[in-house]
């Protein structure tokens, strides 16, 4: 049994709480949160050991591992405390708001030999795992371009104060929504060489962003367009979709299915034939012992627990992988600011801005010689 503690009792924290309590190989030894109301509720009705202070919980509960589900700006400090005490860490996404801190913590976890994982759950969605398998099998040949999208109805009006509406807390469409398709791009293609044309816009939010658009360029690899909007009421809930074009076919994947088009039947994608093929997530997903929000949430926690039990520090969602995503988001934010602050080109001269027929009329006014000179 893995002795595990949980830090943070927001929406994701409560989701993780329900999963780990049902896990047959986990002993939940403590929960930590500043909300005394939530702690009293859980202590009285669930019989859990509750704490308002992280250091006290570590000292008394002696966890082998912790799940960090606090607002993003607290991640770095909490993760560092845990790692320095030899505790394995699962941290919610985004990992850190400063990618340099993400990289530093990744290196610390590696030096300590500790299991480290970040909650990018789309890497545990069967359809996106199938995309990974197909790309590694070179099923669609050389990938030339990707469209990575995410849409949903998170902010549909001017909102009150919460972490989602505050840039300093890690709120905003870029870090909360765009992080997911960006993380998938990192998983499939690594770290891009550069970004360009990034647009980060507000629709309803005052302090942070509601739309993110831009292009990333992978060295000796594809280009990828990112299109994300969390103020889109046409979607009932969050939707992430990737459309991948290659020299020998195409892949379109979301949480529900993986559609594959192959130009011929000679590719190495086992089980796929020429033309369109569809694999549904329900056919690709393994059964889980406990379901909440989606199988991928249980699968990622089970993966973390099994890594601890086996002593393996290799992880599909490691701190190092998440640091790439943090860095790419930082590159896009810097690019968007550079575009906004770029100087505006000087207006054309009066002569060049004058319409063609205006110049012809001027030629007629000054005489036949001027008109001939114009046409020469």
Predicted regions and their residues:
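N-terminal Rossmann-like dinucleotide-binding module
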Residues: 1-45, 372-373
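Beta-loop-alpha module in the N-terminal Rossmann-like domain of NAD(P)-dependent dehydrogenases
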Residues: 16, 48-108
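Short, Asp-centered acidic motifs that coordinate Mg2+ and/or phosphate
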Residues: 30, 64-65, 145
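C-terminal helix-rich "cap/oligomerization" subdomain common to oxidoreductases
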Residues: 65-68, 289-291, 299-376
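Rossmann-fold dehydrogenase core element
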Residues: 104-122, 141-146
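Predominantly a Rossmann-like dinucleotide-binding segment in NAD(P)-dependent oxidoreductases
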Residues: 122-205
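NAD(P)-dinucleotide binding in Rossmann-like oxidoreductases
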Residues: 204-207, 222-299, 315, 372-376
């Amino acid at each position: 049994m893995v002795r595990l503690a949980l830090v943070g009792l927001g929406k994701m924290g409560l989701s993780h709480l329900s999963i780990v309590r049902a896990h047959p190989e986990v002993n939940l030894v403590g929960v930590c949160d500043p909300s005394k109301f939530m702690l009293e509720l859980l202590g009285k009705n669930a019989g859990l050991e509750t704490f308002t202070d992280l250091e006290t919980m570590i000292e008394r509960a002696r966890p082998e591992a912790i799940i960090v589900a606090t607002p993003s700006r607290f991640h770095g400090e909490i993760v560092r405390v845990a790692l320095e005490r030899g505790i394995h860490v699962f941290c919610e996404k985004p990992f850190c708001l400063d990618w340099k801190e993400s990289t530093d913590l990744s290196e610390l976890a590696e030096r300590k030999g500790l299991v480290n994982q970040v909650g990018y759950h789309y890497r545990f969605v069967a359809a996106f795992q199938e995309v990974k398998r197909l790309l590694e099998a070179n099923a669609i040949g050389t990938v030339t371009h990707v469209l990575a999208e995410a849409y949903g109805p998170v902010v549909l009006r001017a909102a009150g104060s919460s972490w989602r509406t505050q840039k300093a807390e890690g709120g905003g469409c870029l870090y909360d929504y765009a992080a997911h398709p960006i993380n998938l791009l990192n998983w499939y293609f690594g770290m891009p060489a550069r970004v360009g044309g990034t647009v980060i816009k507000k629709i309803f939010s005052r302090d942070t962003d509601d739309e993110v658009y831009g292009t990333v360029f992978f060295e000796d690899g594809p280009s990828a367009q990112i299109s994300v909007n969390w103020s889109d009421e046409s979607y009932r809930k969050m939707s992430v979709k990737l459309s991948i074009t290659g020299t020998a076919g195409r892949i379109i994947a979301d949480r529900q299915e993986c559609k594959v088009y192959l130009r011929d039947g000679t590719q190495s994608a086992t089980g796929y034939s020429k033309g369109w093929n569809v694999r549904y997530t329900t056919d690709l997903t393994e059964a889980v012992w406990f379901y909440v929000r989606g199988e991928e949430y249980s699968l990622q926690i089970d993966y973390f627990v099994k890594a601890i039990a086996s002593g393996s520090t290799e992880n599909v969602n490691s701190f190092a992988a998440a640091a790439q995503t943090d860095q790419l988001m930082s590159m896009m934010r810097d690019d968007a600011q550079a575009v906004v602050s770029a100087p505006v080109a000087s207006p054309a001269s009066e002569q060049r801005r004058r319409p063609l027929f205006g110049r012809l009329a001027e030629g007629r006014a000054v005489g036949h010689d001027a008109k001939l000179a114009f046409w020469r």
